[in-house]
Each structure stands twice: as C-alpha cells, then as structure tokens.
C-alpha cells in the first residue's frame, strides 16, 4: 500500500483474480473500520479500481469489491500521482494528455523566439527546460518502454520542435544537429539518465516500497524475455553496460541521535572571509600563525586531506596520533575522500583519547566542514561522522574543526596533502567500499554522454549530411556571447549548415536539386562555399578572417567577425 498525503493505493498481484479480490476486500474492510473509529471517511465517489492485465485475447474477470455498502466501480484508466494509469499499462492516455499540456507551453516559446526581436537562446532554453522538459521528465522512467512506440515518437517530435524554435533553425535542419547545437540530449537518452539516477537513489534505501520490485533477482529474471521490459529489467541492463556496481552503494542511514537533540559542532571559517584568488599565500600563512594557532594552542592538531588523480582516490592524515595514507575506491568523489579522512581521524581520536581531551581538525574542504556544521546531511558517511562526534561529546572529548586554504604553505596541511598523494600510489585493500549513491552520478553522466557521442558519430558516418559534425566532432557545447537574437539565429543556422540562402530550394520543392552559387556559378551553394570558398566575396572576407576551413573559422574567430562579413556581403537578411 502507498500513502501520499490524503491519497492512497492498495495493490495485489496474483495469477488468480479470486485471491486478489479476497485480499483487497480484507484490507478495504480494515481501512473502513479504522476510519470509523478515528472520525474519518473514505469518499466512495473518489474510490476506483483498475484491473491490470496483459492483452492476451482472453476474458479477464473484474473483481467485485465493496467500500461499506457501496460497490467500488472499476475504470479503464485513472490518474494517480500525476500519471494516467491504464489497465494494460500502455500509457497512451498519459502521453496524449502530456502532449496537450506541452503544446500549450510551446506557444509561449513561439512568442518569445521571434528571430528578429526574440529572447536569446540561453534564456529560451531555460524556459523550455522549465515549462516543457520538466513535464517530459516527470515519471518518464515508468513509460520509457511504452508499448506504442509512436507515442514516444510524438514526444520526440514536440521536443525537437521546441529546440528548433529556441535555436531559430529551419525545419530542414538535421535532428541530431539540433540536439548538439542546443546541448540538449535526445529524449531517449534523457529517460535513461533519469531512470539510472532514480535507480541509484532507490538502491540506497531498501525500505522504499519500490526497492524489491527494481532489484530483487526474481523480479528481474521473471521479465527477462518480455517484449516490453519493465524498469527493473532496463535498469539491470543499463547498470551492467555502465559498469556501475550497484551492490556497493551505501545504505541510507538514520542518525543515532535525532537532529533536534544533537549538540552543535564547532567549525571555524575565519580564514574563509578572505578571497583566495586575490590573497597572497604568505598572508594566509601569517594569519594562520598569528590568529589560528594561538587560539588552539592547548589542542592536539590533526590535519586531513583527500586527493583524486587519474580516476584514483585516496586520503591522508597528519597528526601526533600518527600519519595515514590510504587509497579508496576509484569511484569515490573528492568529497567522499575528504569525509573518509575526517572519519578515520575521529575513529583514531575515539580509540586513543581520554576524557576532557581537546582536538582540532584542520581541513581544506569547505563543503565537508559546512556539512559538519549544519548537521543536516543525508550522506551516509557524513551521518557516521556526526554519530561519532556525538559519541565523543558524551565522553567529554572536545573536537573542533577549522578550515584552512590549501597550497599556501601551512605546514600541517602540506604534509597531509603529501600523505594523500602518497596514498594514490598504494594498493586498495581487498574490501568492498560502499559509496554514497551520489558518487556514481558522474559515471551515469559519462555513460550517457558516451552513448550520445556514439549516436552522433554513427549518424554522421552513415549519412554524411550532418555538416555540424565537421565543426563539432564531439558533443561539447559551443558558446555564443553578447550577440543580438538575430545574430545568434544566423550563427546557429550557419553552424548547422541549413540557411535560407542555401536550402530555400527544399522549402520550395523537396525533390529539387541543390542549385549552384548565383554569385560565382562555379560550385554548389553551401555554407562552406559562402564563408570560405566563393571568389565573389574574397575581398570582403579578407577584411575579417583568413580561415581555410569552417572548423578553423568557428574555432579561431569570434562570431561577431562572421556576422560583420555577412552584413558587408549583403547576405544578412538571406540567412
């Protein structure tokens, strides 16, 4: 049973309808009794049932259920938690409803994206992501393997139309070029990314109602050969391809002491008031020696640091309790390495310190110390740190923290940094490191970008019509600054390779052959011919750039030079 505020759902799964009917009725009766005793009522008008079944051509009996004296009506589809669920889980009605809502939002982008006076591309993409993509993202992992592929294709069409309007591109523009130019991944890859992130989060919380449905072996194996595999089967395949060991994800932890009962932790950020980028290292070192060290004169000093280089992570500790250099899982983030260092020194303090001992931990990770200070982190390693700190407080052992800038000549910090770097060259102990699920998000991003890059290269190699691939062999975004909307649109069209001047023949007749350049009549008209090769514009071109190829032009010269050439050549309103 799921309960969300004042909505709840009861569900059962079985091969026999009679068993489901009996179990549902028992639970409905229990809920009715509880509500009567506690002064609540369940609205029978808003209570419905759905019988989920496969369309195998057989008759499926609908259960007969009662809420009090009222018969519960069964419907073919119903909206719950923002998704429209139908009896065969095709999600056809949900996607149809989603398209209707998104098309209304698309009208806003149409108004804002006028090519002469509209908003800039960056702002339009923000509006698109806030109004349309957010709706497309919600619950998308549920219907990512929808039965009717045409429904998913309809979403792709709307998605592409919104991107095209943001860029000011023509309808003839290659689809993959639109994605790369806008730095907006295809919906198929977007759904995979969101599904994997969702899976990581659920894996860290075994108490979540969907955990067993997604990760129990029997759940995965039972759908192994399904034509339309559920999310559990898809996730298992995705994590395997991305080489993400989901069994090593740390389990969500609840603090031993409730947050409202925890004693606050002392964290000093006095040196953080100075901007490191504009402050001399000698000033930080002098300030540390004159202000910080005297304040902690009767404390035992401990220095910690984390390091990550070439996908290898380690941490180091320097203190009178001993030095430590230790390598940890390669999937660890630098944030995790810093936390592991602090966790290790606290364990050492706990095992060796006496009552009323005083320690100060110097660390150059501001984000880790902020998490220790606000005590609201959900990171399992950080919760372990906070639990150890509360235990030390009960034993009258004082531990305070102080932020110090890195690489400014503070002796203890430099030695801890050396220990961390030395740890990079050690071997990992034969131990399964359980990491926070957030540490695997970069691997998800890397995997999705890899799929996108393969798709980008494959499309170019197969069709050879994606002109943008010559400028952008990788999917890295191209940034445009300080241009008007009209100028931005021109640059986007030139980069994509489809302009009014070069492709208007397609708008007139899709079967018409590409014409020759009307200015020199020596070659087929194209963006490359106009910007690089056409002899008619050679003198004007030499005033602004001397590039030998389109890639050289867009890599070396600011877009404003290209715009000035287009204006002087009299082509500004023809692009």
Where are these regions (language model features)?
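Catalytic palm active-site di-aspartate
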Residues: 1-17, 35, 39-51, 76-87, ...
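Mobile genetic element proteins and their domesticated derivatives, centered on retroelements
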Residues: 6-8, 31, 35, 49, ...
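Catalytic palm subdomain of template-directed nucleic-acid polymerases
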Residues: 8-33, 54, 370-374
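Basic, alpha-helical interaction scaffolds
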Residues: 69-142
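Short, conserved micro-motifs composed of acidic
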Residues: 26, 40-76
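RNase H-like nuclease fold core
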Residues: 280-354, 372, 380
């Amino acid at each position: 049973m799921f309960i969300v505020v004042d909505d709840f759902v009861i569900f059962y799964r079985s091969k026999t309808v009679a068993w489901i009917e009996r179990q549902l009725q028992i639970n409905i009766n229990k809920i009715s009794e509880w509500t009567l005793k506690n002064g609540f009522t369940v609205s029978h008008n808003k209570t419905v049932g759905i019988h989920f079944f496969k369309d195998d051509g057989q008759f499926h009996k609908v259960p007969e259920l009662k809420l009090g004296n009222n018969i519960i009506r069964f419907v073919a589809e119903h909206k719950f938690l923002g998704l429209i669920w139908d009896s065969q889980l095709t999600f056809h009605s949900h996607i149809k409803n989603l398209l209707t809502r998104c098309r209304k939002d698309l009208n806003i982008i149409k108004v804002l994206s006028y090519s002469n006076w509209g908003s800039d591309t960056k702002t339009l993409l923000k509006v698109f992501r806030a109004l349309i993509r957010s709706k497309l993202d919600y619950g998308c992992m549920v219907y990512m393997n929808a039965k009717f592929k045409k429904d998913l294709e309809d979403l792709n069409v709307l998605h592409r139309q919104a991107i095209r309007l943001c860029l000011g591109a023509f309808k003839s523009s290659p689809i993959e070029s639109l994605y790369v130019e806008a730095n907006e991944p295809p919906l198929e890859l977007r759904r995979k990314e969101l599904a994997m992130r969702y899976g990581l989060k659920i894996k860290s919380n075994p108490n979540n109602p969907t955990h067993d449905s997604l990760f129990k072996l029997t759940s995965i194996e039972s759908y192994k050969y399904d034509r339309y595999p559920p999310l559990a089967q898809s996730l298992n395949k995705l994590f395997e391809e991305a080489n993400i060991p989901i069994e090593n994800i740390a389990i969500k932890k609840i603090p031993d002491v409730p947050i409202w009962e925890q004693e606050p932790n002392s964290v000093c950020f006095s040196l953080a008031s100075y901007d490191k980028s504009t402050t001399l290292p000698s000033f930080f070192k002098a300030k540390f020696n004159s202000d910080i060290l005297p304040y902690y004169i009767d404390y035992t000093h401990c220095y910690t640091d984390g390091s990550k280089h070439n996908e290898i992570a380690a941490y180091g500790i320097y203190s009178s309790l001993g030095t430590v250099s230790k390598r940890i899982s390669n999937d660890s983030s630098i944030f995790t390495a810093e936390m592991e260092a602090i966790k290790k020194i606290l364990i050492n303090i706990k095992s060796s310190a006496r009552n009323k001992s005083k320690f100060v931990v110097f660390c150059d990770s501001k984000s880790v110390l902020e998490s220790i200070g606000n005590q609201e982190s959900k990171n399992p390693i950080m919760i372990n740190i906070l639990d150890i700190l509360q235990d030390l407080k009960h034993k009258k052992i004082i531990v305070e923290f102080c932020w110090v800038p890195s690489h400014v000549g503070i002796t203890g910090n430099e030695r801890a940094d050396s220990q961390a770097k030395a740890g990079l060259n050690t071997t990992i102990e034969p131990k399964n490191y359980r990491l926070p699920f957030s540490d695997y998000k970069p691997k998800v991003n890397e995997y999705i970008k890899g799929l996108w890059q393969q798709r980008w290269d494959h499309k170019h190699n197969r069709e050879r019509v994606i002109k943008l691939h010559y400028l952008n062999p990788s999917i890295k975004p191209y940034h445009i600054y300080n241009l008007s909307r009209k100028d931005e649109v021109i640059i986007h069209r030139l980069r994509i390779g489809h302009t009014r001047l070069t492709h208007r023949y397609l708008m007139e007749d899709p079967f018409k052959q590409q014409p020759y350049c009307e200015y020199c009549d020596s070659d087929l008209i194209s963006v490359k011919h106009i910007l690089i090769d056409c002899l008619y514009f050679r003198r004007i071109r030499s005033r602004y750039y001397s590039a030998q190829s389109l890639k050289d032009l867009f890599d070396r010269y600011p877009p404003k030079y290209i715009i000035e050439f287009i204006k002087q050549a009299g082509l500004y309103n023809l692009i």
